[in-house]
Structures are given as C-alpha cells and as structure tokens.
C-alpha cells in the first residue's frame, strides 16, 4: 500500500456521553468505508472486550484507519480513535485527543448535553482541536434538535446552528458527515524528513508478540526494521512489525508524520514502552521527547486479595499486564491480618474499580476479595509532619493526630428543573456546599463542593435515581479541607478486623456503626459459642450486637430422673462454651467485607 500524502490524512476522535450512540456511529463509518466485509460486521465492532459489550460502555480507546472517497474525487485516510464516555475513563479520552486534530461532538438529539461531554469538550478545545457538533438519534420521536442546538451553544459555547443531524442506527446522513469532516478538520502537520518523534497513545501485552504500542507519528518516518529508541528508558529495539487497524491488523512498510498505527518491537518487558512516551530513531534521535499526557492520580483506593494464597504470584503478574493496558491503575503490595497478602490498588472511581476486578477475574481466572474503598486523606500530626493515608489501618493513634483533612471535589451537575429539589436534597445529605446555580434554557447547571469520599462511593448511582436518569455529573479533585473524621473499627470477638475498618465523619459514626454491626450479624455464621460484634472509635464502643450460639441439646438422653443430673450436663456444656469462646476463631465470609460497601447504598 502506498504512503498517502499528508494533506489527505485526517485524525479525529468522537466525544460523546454514554449511550449517545458513539460506538454505533463508528460502526457506520467502518461499514461505509469498507473496513470490514458484511460477514465480519457485528454491532459495536470497536468494543472488543466482553465487559464493554455486556455493559454497553466503551472502556478502552481503540483506533481504526479508514479510506474514504470524497466527492472531490480524492481518497482520504481517516484515522479514527474511539474514546470512552464515562467519567471514570476520562484519562483515556485525553490520551486519544492528544493524537488528533479534530473531534466530533456527538449529542443525543433527545437527551441533550451532559456534564461529562462538556468537560471532555473543553479538554479538546484546550488542546487546540477543531470541534464539529453532530446531533445523533434524529429518528427518535422525542428528538428535539432545535432545543439541543441551543443547549450546545449555551452550555459549551460553540457555534452549533449548522450541526449535522444524523441517525447512526439507520445510517442516515453519515456520508454527509464524513464529507464535512474532511473539509472542517485540518490535516496533520509534521516534517516526514525530520528526526522521528512518535507518541505512544496506548499499549497492550500480547503473549506472542510482546508489547504492542499504538502510536501517532508527529515528525519523521518510521520504517519496518528501523532501530528505535524508547526515550524514557533509553533502550533500543528493532521495529519488527508496523501497520494500522482497519479494524483488522494490516501490516505496512512505513508510517510517516501524521499517521496513526501500531508498532511491535519485540519488547518483552511489560514496562518497556510506557504510555505517553516518545519513540525515536536510535541513530538520529530527536532532541527532546514530546509532551506526554498529564499523569492521572487515583481517587479511590481498595485492597485486593486473592482468596487462595497460592494465587499471589499469578495475581501480581496479572496486575502488571493489566497496568500496561490501563495506565490509571496503581498498585503496591499490602498485607492484612484478616486476608493475608495482597495489593493496595488505586482507581479513578467505583466503575473503574469494578471493571478492573472483573477483568482480573475473567481474563486471568483469579478469585479476589475487595476491601471497602477509601480515598486519600491528608493527616497533620502534632509534630507538624504531613502524611497521606489511603488505608484506614495506617491511620496514626488519635493522640498523635493534629488534624485530618479530607479531599474535596468540585462537582458540576446538569439536571432538568423538575428534579432540582431531589438533587439538592441528595447533595446536602452528602455534605455538599452549593457554589453556583444557573438556569439554562432547559437545564439547570449546579456546582457543588462535595467531599470526594461521598462522591466516589455511590453518588453517581444515587444521582441517577434521584433524577430518573436525566442528571449528569462531572467531578474533579479540588483541595483538602479539615474535617471532623474518625476511624471506625470493627471488633469480632474482641479482635479488630483491619479489613473492615473505615474512616467516617463523626456525625455519621454512630449510625454507620449500628448499620454495620447489624449487617454483619446476619452474615457471620453461628458458631458453637456467642460471637460479639462491636463498632468502636478508639477505645470507646459505640454499637454492639451478638451472634447467638448454636446449642446442642445435651439433656436429650436423660429420661426423667434426678434434676441434678441434667444440671451437671448443662454446667459442663456451659464451661466448654466458655473455654471455646476464649480460643475459638471466627471465619469471616467474603459477603461480610462487601457488606461494608452496601451499607451506604440502602
């Protein structure tokens, strides 16, 4: 295949909220440009993971190169990079945008603009991309394009009166959209003769090929067989295979400035080609690496432990392979008295945490226990030291703590006026402080400062149910703020269970302690002795319940006769139970750890 001239290349991605029809539109592009034969077409071609198809969401960014014949008679090479729409995967979006010159802003003509779309769209505009508004689902009876166009102009602030109206499901106006895309989005710039600079947008591990990297060539030309250098590690490799996806893998001889494609260089070390790094030639190397992406900080932390301790090594390898493919995942070894050895993992949000756990269990056949998720707190000790704690069991003694500061997030919410009351009530319940309230044409834009610990756990789900699915949310960490927080310990038979400890606000501690002990009472199986379940703040017990003992009928064999005989047997049983209570261990089932998560949801 001959190398196409740079002026006929267009690199673009699609910005859209979940369920606004982004993956369906991508399918139509592939069909229209003949990327796959009719037999190979299936719905959501680019959502390659089973989880993506089951949940109907896009998690990983994918890339496709399509050839499109325009009305002007020229063939254009369209490099389309698919992006996820959920707030937890926003870092994937910023990586995709770094490889593009333009973006399609796809908005559902019935639902209107959502908060997450606004945030991503601003990222695209900041990176200097041309944003092209598109109205999708125009075939729906409840579609109201005029209202949505007004909303795009009011909320995002870009011209939208000539937005293209398409129906991706029916394939209506998709060709017209591609025609306009070719005109509106500029071709890439970059000198093909300059020293090579290629930005790694994504990487994944293939058992046969090693690390496969998705790259965008910014300058220079990468040819098959070239000796290339990874700029951050300084290691050299040979480019064994290069090519692009159509969406099938198609080998090429070279990738020149402006192109998007994959490189296989026999890198067997999982961290050999980190995402956001720059590839260059080993001999004529570029002077400086390209600016990468901003490093994402994990917001939610949880302990992940294998149920079988023999699975620790496979679990560690699985995490390393997954981290290559998911740059936002963070992990470090951790041990727990209750659960043994495992890892403390950092995630971007609860959905990210669920997806990671599900991928580990499915793709690597592991059985895992997850502890209650927490956020990272800033602790100022009485000695004036500053500590960051993301694990309740690492919290210093209460006497040594000067001040605990919790992370505060700024949450932007868009909601129809009908549900405003319910959403405000929810924000107040979550200890939110209102900063801004703005009435737009058909929506209300609200800005709240809410503690991050309240946002990440179940705020998104509660917001959706309070607004019947119409509200949308975008949040970001803002600052740390002093708060009256305490560590809530759970004791079972007088023993602290480190995996069940949580950090809560003092006002909520009593309620939370009572709910937790009640829930655990139902989940811990009855033993031959009474089991006390207590919630404590420091040395003060604030709630208690008991799991009553199972009792064998020891007097069943006595028929009539002397009462002292029965009494003797009962006393003997009582003494045995007392001894058992001192030495007996209680096995805590997996459900008990999950109870900590579910207490908040009810």
UniProtKB/Swiss-Prot annotation:
GO biological process: positive regulation of translation
Family the entry assigns: Belongs to the TRAFAC class translation factor GTPase superfamily. Classic translation factor GTPase family. LepA subfamily.
Protein name: Elongation factor 4
Keywords of this entry: Cell inner membrane, Cell membrane, GTP-binding, Hydrolase, Membrane, Nucleotide-binding, Protein biosynthesis
Function: Required for accurate and efficient protein synthesis under certain stress conditions. May act as a fidelity factor of the translation reaction, by catalyzing a one-codon backward translocation of tRNAs on improperly translocated ribosomes. Back-translocation proceeds from a post-translocation (POST) complex to a pre-translocation (PRE) complex, thus giving elongation factor G a second chance to translocate the tRNAs correctly. Binds to ribosomes in a GTP-dependent manner.
Ranges for domain tr-type G: 7-189
Entry superkingdom: Bacteria
Organism: Coxiella burnetii (strain Dugway 5J108-111)
Keyword Transcription regulation among UniProt keywords: no
Pfam families membership: EFG_C (PF00679), GTP_EFTU (PF00009), GTP_EFTU_D2 (PF03144), LepA_C (PF06421)
Gene3D superfamilies: 3.30.70.240, Elongation factor 4, C-terminal domain (3.30.70.2570), Elongation Factor G (Translational Gtpase), domain 3 (3.30.70.870), P-loop containing nucleotide triphosphate hydrolases (3.40.50.300), Translation factors (2.40.30.10)
PROSITE patterns membership: G_TR_1, G_TR_2
Principal location: membrane
Entry coiled-coil feature ranges: none
Known catalytic reactions: GTP + H2O = GDP + phosphate + H(+)
Gene, per the UniProt record: lepA
